[in-house]
Amino acid sequence: NETIDYIKSIRDPLADHCPTEYIVKPLTDYEFYAYNFDIIQHNRKYRGQYNIPGQRNTTSYFLITTFKCIALLLAKQRNFFNTQYYAWVDLGCNHVLKNVQECAPAILDNPQPKISACYIHYRSKEELADLATFFKDGGPCGMAATFFTAEATYIDRFYNAMMEIFNEQLCKQLGHSDEQVMTYCYDRYPDLFTIYNGEYYSILTNYHQPKT
């Protein structure tokens, strides 16, 4: 409740120009979270890289980040604003993304086709060939999922591809966050994506053309 009240205090004054629909439901009430939580908890008992004290990558973190593709699917199905494009933006992205006020409107005015995301550290097919080897030290950097846009006609396939890879990782007692899932998703289904390059600070600034 504290979060929704805070968000409304920011969004509601902009209602004439930026209408907002709110879906208020605890993440723990979604089947995706409830069903997979115990599986991931069990898996991590057997993987040393996930048993380091103080590590931020908890079971909830893996599920919360991967939920992004489900949230996009739900938004597309409800289609509140009859739009052809959607965007995911991490709450609190200002701590890492540059020039949000300048770049975000330009992106919304001219979105890239397909699933458009920033690839930070390219991973070859050889690097991705064996899941256990790729995840042996945790979650290597690949694609960024802090912000990306999605053309509506690609969201169903993107969701299914992400869930396929997420479930494969769970089956092999692995998994770190959505960014590793998306890295494998691009490797296997590159036709779903419009890729650009950069690093975390330039995810927005490089969306239309490289600046860093």
Question: Which functions belong to the PLM regions below?
Answer:
Residues 1-9, 125-127:
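Short, charged/polar "capping" segments at the starts of alpha-helices
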Residues 26-29, 76, 93-95, 119-122, ...:
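Short, flexible loop/turn elements at secondary-structure junctions
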Residues 115-131:
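Short beta-strand-to-loop element that shapes/binds the nucleotide-sugar donor at the catalytic cleft/hinge
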Residues 12-23, 112-113, 187-196:
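Structural alpha-beta junctions
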Residues 5-80:
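Active-site-proximal specificity loops/subdomain of glycosyltransferases
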Residues 95-99, 117, 137-212:
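Catalytic core and acceptor-binding pocket of nucleotide-sugar-dependent glycosyltransferases
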Residues 83, 97-102, 127-132, 160-161:
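A short secondary-structure junction signal
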Residues 60, 64-118:
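GT-A fold catalytic core of metal-dependent nucleotide-sugar glycosyltransferases
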